[in-house]
Amino acid sequence: MPENPAAEKMQVLQVLDRLRGKLQEKGDTTQNEKLSAFYETLKSPLFNQILTLQQSIKQLKGQLSHIPSDCSANFDFSRKGLLVFTDGSITNGNAQRPCSNVTASELLPWTQKSASEDFNSVIQQMAQGRHVEYIDIERPSTGGLGFSVVALRSQSLGLIDIFVKEVHPGSVADRDHRLKENDQILAINDTPLDQNISHQQAIALLQQATGSLRLVVAREVGHTQGRASTSSADTTLPETVCWGHTEEVELINDGSGLGFGIVGGKSSGVVVRTIVPGGLADRDGRLQTGDHILKIGGTNVQGMTSEQVAQVLRNCGNSVRMLVARDPVGEIAVTPPTPVSLPVALPAVATRTLDSDRSPFETYSVELVKKDGQSLGIRIVGYVGTAHPGEASGIYVKSIIPGSAAYHNGQIQVNDKIVAVDGVNIQGFANQDVVEVLRNAGQVVHLTLVRRKTSLSASPFEHSSSRETVAEPPKVPERAGSPKPEANLSVEAEEIGERLDNLKNNTVQALEKPDVYPEKVPGSPENELKSRWENLLGPDYEVMVATLDAQIADDEELQKYSKLLPIHTLRLGMEVDSFDGHHYISSVAPGGPVDTLNLLQPEDELLEVNGMQLYGKSRREAVSFLKEVPPPFTLVCCRRLFDDEASVDEPRTMEPALLEAEVDHSVDVNIEDDDDGELALWSPEVKTVELVKDCKGLGFSILDYQDPLDPTRSVIVIRSLVADGVAERSGELLPGDRLVSVNEFSLDNATLAEAVEVLKAVPPGVVHLGICKPLVEDEKEERFSLHSNNNGDSSEPADAVHEIHSSLILEAPQGFRDEPYLEELVDEPFLDLGKSLQFQQKDVDSSSEAWEMHEFLSPPLDGRGEEREMLVDEEYELYQDHLRAMESNPPPPHIREAAPASPVLELQAGTQWLHANLSGGERLECHDAESMMSAYPQEMQQYSYSTADMMEETFGLDSRAPIPSSEGNGQHGRFDDMGHLHSLTSSSLDLGMMIPSDLQGPGVLVDLPAVAQRREQEDLPLYRLPSARVVTKPSSHMGLVSSRHANAACELPEREEGEGEETPNFSHWGPPRIVEIFREPNVSLGISIVGGQTVIKRLKNGEELKGIFIKQVLEDSPAGKTNALKTGDKILEVSGVDLQNASHAEAVEAIKSAGNPVVFVVQSLSSTPRVIPTVNNKGKTPAPNQDQNTQERKAKRHGTAPPPMKLPPPYRAPSADMEGSEEDCALTDKKIRQRYADLPGELHIIELEKDKNGLGLSLAGNKDRSRMSIFVVGINPEGPAAADGRMRIGDELLEINNQILYGRSHQNASAIIKTAPTRVKLVFIRNEDAVSQMAVAPFPELSHSPSPVEDLGGTELVSSEEESSVDAKHLPEPESSKPEDLSQVVDDNMVAEQQKESESPDSAACQIKQQTYSTQVSSSSQDSPSSPAPLCQSAHADVTGSGNFQAPLPVDPAPLSVDPATCPIVPGQEMIIEISKGRSGLGLSIVGGKDTPLDAIVIHEVYEEGAAARDGRLWAGDQILEVNGVDLRSSSHEEAITALRQTPQKVRLVVYRDEAQYRDEENLEVFLVDLQKKTGRGLGLSIVGKRSGSGVFISDIVKGGAADLDGRLIRGDQILSVNGEDMRHASQETVATILKCVQGLVQLEIGRLRAGSWAASRKTSQNSQGDQHSAHSSCRPSFAPVITSLQNLVGTKRSSDPPQKCTEEEPRTVEIIRELSDALGISIAGGKGSPLGDIPIFIAMIQANGVAARTQKLKVGDRIVSINGQPLDGLSHTDAVNLLKNAFGRIILQVVADTNISAIATQLEIMSAGSQLGSPTADRHPEDTEEQMQRTAD
């Protein structure tokens, strides 16, 4: 059997890992299954249990061999396999004879070495007459030995002895029952702990022992014999204590915590120390401060430590039941533990009596009485001095806590030296030992202290001793020495010290930062300010007072230096970040007033300015004050005295000084678990990195970081890399990597100082480092607050290293940031993105500090050294200043040139905007026709670039004259719907462009992406223009984009052939594009670059970001005039020279050496991830139609939550390697043919090349709505498909580029087609029956007299993300044969709307819309000649008078009147209704508005007590278009609320109902949102439930909260689930409780109403209104209920058609299997008492996602005869609906195809859809005509 199976098991696992890795590298997968099974076996709990059991059996054999014959051996095994003795004699002591009869020699069961005379004599000498015990303990496979030790100095021998401090209950040592507290360990594994073994070596022996641990301990004889009787007295309160009151308290945790804190220990008991005001315990009212906790549940906690009690509380779950006691009868006398060494005899001295004439000190004694739950109230610090031996060494009082026992005593002062505690001389004790002695003291503590007389000042802390300054931090004089950590001697900290490594206290070395504070005159105002704030803040903060006397003329003069920077930044030279009343310096501008002081630095907190306290004020108040406060400025700042980092190879050179390395031992026990959600994790795989250490070291610095898996341990993390150091050159180390070993020395649980010593001790040469890389987790993002003192001066040497100070605050600052925090990756690199940008990683914590931005002002070309770095404040008022600045600075002349007639928007380069965490609710409106376009996406924040090692270069070279060109001026573009695009983000940086829309001329072409996402943004509407491509007009002074690249510039970006594939499915980089810049004589190119071979940052997908990036583009330069390059673009190639792996110098040389023109290949970041096909990843989207005769068409885009974050793949150079492609193609084609072998028809596989207009195909769906098909309904004769000749109308698309379209809806197909690359591989099938299945008849061939078109009601354009309207893109205009006017191509992202008839009176759009209407009516009338026509014609009917189309039937001259007070609301119609409010209000809750993605005013809920509920016609989901003549179609949310509130007694509403939007979740945009919930903080959102019905919705989003910072949620979103738990039918209270209780990462499933229907209905209403104005007929369009027409139709059918039996087919039986969670998916109409008359019940609609559609046996118009055998004859509509709703399992329907019913169903469908005159939502169906025209039976 192995000696140490646990260790060997880990070795085997490591071997398996290596083996699997090697096999994977070789591509061998044959052994994967066996290796996985072996691996899982070793990791299984059962296997571990077997190993533990084997060890227990081995241990049992050893125990049994030592038990005397007169003792029984009762034992058992625990469930985990651990050995447990149950014998009474063993329990009370050892399994042996009484001690008086047993000698040490009889109990030596071990080897000859152990039994040797030498060993025995050493042990007996060390025991000094005490009883000797020999103990053998088996170390378990997991966990420790279960006891802690303490080192105390022996007074007799002067040696450090090791004593057992505590045996942990339930541990291995506790179950063995032999090791006792206060036992002295004499030997470990046969090694005596004599003078040859140091304290550290002894600890190492215990920690490194494996297998069996053999201990020899010494114990006092009396202590051993009386142990059984005294143990309880030592660990618990005396049993004789009588409590005056005991009470059982039960608390139900609601997720906010129990609301009380505990302190105490084993001897004093655990008591309630604090009760949080407003917390759970406070609200309950029964628990009181000072209560002793006796029991928790069924667990007796007397004798436990406070930490153990806290753990018991944590394990209780939500319900905590406690037995507490108070008011003890009589005094509780707790006997302090007997000291292990005799107390030193001190001379009996009176208080403050010593020979004062001879000694510089005075000694006095103090008696302190602890109160229950209170500490002594002193904080100590240890110091080992070398300058004055015997004088300064010792333990000193560092500070006194106000209100504590020491404070009330009044005798103890700061800087007093403690020499004895309860008579025990502590001089020479280690700091940790003194802490233990004081903790173990009883209720009354006697302290002996020494104080230097006031006339002398040799104390290690020169400080005033007055009572007023007891909390003041001591100043530290320059003195050689090393501090001991300070400790707060509080009872509540009793257990924390036990977890600290004693070694750390003696090895931490720290260097004090140099004293840079100017000397202050005593008694000066500065000193008074400093003293006042020091008293307020306490010793953890350093207060600094600075005076600035800056010469400032006026604000306008300042603003000349920067149009973007706020006034207070320019005045003070620093930027301030604010959070929760705290204002921190985020950065200091180089050369500014603050920088010249050399006093303040980033992360300092600004407390007061010119007597005005800023602490506690809002950011707006603080910034407003800083703007107006006059100079000189008196600043009061504080800095936290905490630094836990050290540099490995380059320690900072400083003056020898004393620094207090504070280790705070105090803790307020928190019942809630710590939230480790933010802590980084590292891969368990250890990677070995080999570095060659040179004379400069290894070239990196480190810091320690709390281990996320064990809060008591720390790990060593790479902090930063030294520029051009060994580590950076190797490229294998990055900041954030965990350092686990150096050569053979493991750094597991090593302290920072130890790790530093190990690294320094490594000799020069090859060094092997063990590295663990960070795990990549998308839902966990750390926040890095980056501040730099880098001035960006390019004249600095390249190897200059700039210190970058920044930190990661793991805890949200509470109070005054008075809790210690750790640091992580403090030198996280960043990028100064020229002109105005420093990006930070996005933060989800509400404690985040504001975004920052560093700007480099554009210097003159001859003055690069004068660059200044400044900051931009994020206050919203600044943007108004920016706008005014823009208005006062017109664009350059070349942009303001006159232009031809075509309206084109030009991009004004260089005008950049910032949006950063606006806190106000005000909205900045775009001035005049200007629009703000965000040119940078939110995802760009994820990239940070280091400028520490980068040099920037401005190319100011002589160049030849530009080459004139006459090409490239024919391409013009247009922004569509500039006024309606909104920014996607509200809490991120957006760099925008000002675009004056009133400029004319063919100057700039900018193409929008396929999808422009929008989201509600309350602060500032910014507009995003991602991936802008530009084409400039030819000019003698402007760079050109040559004609051979003009087409590429006009199109959405695409990869050229052979550029390689991208591995991620999404890329935030746009594809490479070519930009040509023509040089001009004596003018520089106008760009500066940064970057090189240095790895800038590790991306989240593991890639390394590096390369050459554009830092700045000068406006009036050749590069700036092209508008084709912008800050942040990555340069891949320059005039054929690949720069992807080039150094900075090589890139500079390549640009200098490039000819004329300079040809750049660049990549830009796009606003939304570009979908990359998985097989052929060369993506492209065609450009919009460049038709100059059409008006700007408005296409409202509504985006869901942003797609998951992915990162750009590395760019790969073009490759011409085509080997094997033909074989792969043949193999793929064979698989495709096998896949579709069962489909009827002829399969075709072709490849086409897209042109600028796409493939030239028009697509439509299947006539049968239950089937998903994509048919070709039109082919552009000038398009690639027609030129190829192999595709025909009627072909059904199955695949595009190996992405399957078969069985997909139009929405899915549209998304796939949009991302198709230039070369498209199409798989389609040709079937003769396809034409009859198509929802749209084939488009006619191009002619001057278009033939009639069939019904287009089922058409859905592939070009739109949402359901698109039928528009001019389908058909050519009748009077034009230009290629541009032909059928619109696939993937066009523009939707036509509102064609003006004056411009194109016979346009195809109008013809199609009319034909949709008239043809449908005609088709109905063929069956029924007397079928009624629409009640009134619109303008579209008049347009058709040209004779191109079949004229509609005559109009009924007498339309029925509609009473607005009683008429029902017909789905799909704009209805006018009137509601009398009575004495109550309307009772409506609305959501949406023009300023929201919903883009419409929609009723959210109808309250029962309101007038609308009494009226009964309005439903939740109805859209309100008008209120008493006030148009709400384009109103904001607040405007709509105002209009509804100001209504008179009778309210006239125009409403629109689209029931399909609310029928099921198919009409919700469902997406996931991950929010990180911090401890003690909420998610930052409010919820509300409906008063009637189910569903919980977001009612408000708290500014600065997690939801607000995430930015994806808006008011009105429905919460569908929380962490996978369904909330669709949960109550508001249930959801609120769950959201409060969750911790860490919270995943919300959100449903948001699709905005397409609202936008579509608005378009419909606008069309209708426009038609009314232009109608030739005097008849006003009527929206009379469709019911009337249907009733006429039914009557006509009954009177004119033959008997029913002649029209019926044979009944057929349809079987449906329906689960409880399934939707049946059919809607019915008819029934007894129906508004349509007493007609049979029939199927009005079949939903594609229902179970009924899967049978493919039901059709719209089928009459239902019976349900599960129950006939429906005579049943009402409601009864039939209930039957279907309650039918589950096996459902048998008998249906029959009835032509009468089919005609009614068809007419119902036509009238509800056709009355919209070509509604954009082509597959919207009013499925029913009962009351509100439909009820869904599911």
Curated annotation (Swiss-Prot):
Modified residues (Phosphoserine): 455, 459, 482, 524, 647, 1215
Alphabetically ordered keywords of this record: Cell junction, Cell membrane, Cytoplasm, Membrane, Phosphoprotein, Repeat, Tight junction
Domain (PDZ) ranges: 134-221, 248-328, 365-453, 555-641, 688-774, 1074-1166, 1245-1328, 1472-1555, 1568-1650, 1709-1795
The keyword Cell membrane appears for this protein: yes
Bias-annotated ranges (Polar residues): 1171-1189, 1658-1676
Highest taxon, organism lineage: Eukaryota
Annotated S-S bridges: none
One Gene Ontology CC term in the entry: subapical complex
InterPro entries found in the cross-reference section: L27_2, L27_dom, L27_dom_sf, PDZ, PDZ_scaffold, PDZ_sf
GO biological process, one term: establishment of apical/basal cell polarity
PROSITE patterns: L27, PDZ
Compartments (UniProt record): Cell junction, Tight junction; Apical cell membrane; Cytoplasm, Perinuclear region
Coiled-coil ranges (or none): none
Biased composition (Basic and acidic residues): 464-478, 1366-1381
Biased composition (Pro residues): 1201-1212
Location of the L27 domain: 1-65
Cytoplasm among keywords: yes
Region annotated Disordered, chain positions: 456-488, 1171-1219, 1340-1453, 1657-1676, 1811-1834
Biological function: Scaffolding protein that facilitates the localization of proteins to the cell membrane. Required for the correct formation of tight junctions and epithelial apico-basal polarity. Acts (via its L27 domain) as an apical connector and elongation factor for multistranded TJP1/ZO1 condensates that form a tight junction belt, thereby required for the formation of the tight junction-mediated cell barrier. Positively regulates epithelial cell microtubule elongation and cell migration, possibly via facilitating localization of PRKCI/aPKC and PAR3D/PAR3 at the leading edge of migrating cells.
Quaternary context: Forms a ternary complex with PALS1 and CRB1. Component of a complex whose core is composed of ARHGAP17, AMOT, PALS1, INADL/PATJ and PARD3/PAR3. Forms a heterotrimeric complex composed of MMP5, LIN7B and PATJ; the N-terminal L27 domain of PALS1 interacts with the L27 domain of PATJ and the C-terminal L27 domain of PALS1 interacts with the L27 domain of LIN7B. Component of a complex composed of CRB3, PALS1 and PATJ. As part of the Crumbs complex; interacts with WWP1, the interaction is enhanced by AMOTL2 and facilitates WWP1 localization to the plasma membrane.
Name of the protein: InaD-like protein
Species name: Mus musculus (Mouse)
